[in-house]
Amino acid sequence: MIPLSDTIKNKLNYGLYIVSTPIGNLSDITIRAINILENSDYILCEDTRISKKLLDRYKIKSKLISNHKFNEIKNLNKIIEILKSEKIVSLVSDAGTPAISDPGRIIINECIKNKINIYPIPGPSAVSTAVSISGFSEKYFFY
């Protein structure tokens, strides 16, 4: 792992980082995603128990906040206040990219309304992985 130095952490912009996580193999995570999570003040997790397995693997000790479909509206004001206090907050889902068939849309829309910066951190994609071995021409693939 290539950790960010304190000087690089100071250069990270505060706001909400939408961090893609592995979709099956914990090794399928980008160095950038690890560094962002490692330097987050808070990580919003769809299921903290599942996220903790990934975070423990990479020795990431950021504070976790449960953020799933049953509590995301209830937690919204608290999270927006944290973001307005110029913190680095990451949002992760159990697997893949948050807000793509996972929680995240509500907090993202609220950040847009409040002019809070949002930064997407790309990662693995089940769709492109499946298409890559399908034998289909990309001309006939629509998403």
What residue ranges belong to the model's regions?
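Structural motif
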Residues: 46, 67, 92-94, 119-121
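Loop/turn-to-beta-strand initiation segments
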Residues: 14-16, 85-90
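Short glycine-rich anion-binding loops that position phosphate/pyrophosphate groups of nucleotides
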Residues: 23-26, 94-98
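Alpha-helix capping/helix-boundary segments
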Residues: 49-51, 97, 126
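Glycine-rich, flexible N-terminal cofactor/catalytic loop recognition
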Residues: 2-70
